[in-house]
Amino acid sequence: DSDITIDGRHKIYINKSNTSGNNYDIQVGTGANVNIQVDSGDVNLVTVQGKINVNSGGDYNVKVGGNYNMTVAGSRSVTVEGTTTDNTTGSVTHRGSRIDLNP
């Protein structure tokens, strides 16, 4: 076991020369986890150009302690290969120029 404690601002700049194909991988072996913890502050994932892709071999769980807001600049498509259940204790509002429930 080893712990490293550092103070101050630090930045890791990968592929500063902008060479195509210089990818950076973090791989963790079987039976271990990766945890990222911020005690007070934000976690920001940003791509200036490109996508953010998440692939899970099992369940994908999200727990939000406050509000959940999503803004989509293009279209939104959801495909479910099973059932969908939404449980809401408050009101539900759907707005659109046209809403087709059973097209």
Residue positions per predicted region:
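Right-handed beta-helix
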Residues: D1-P103
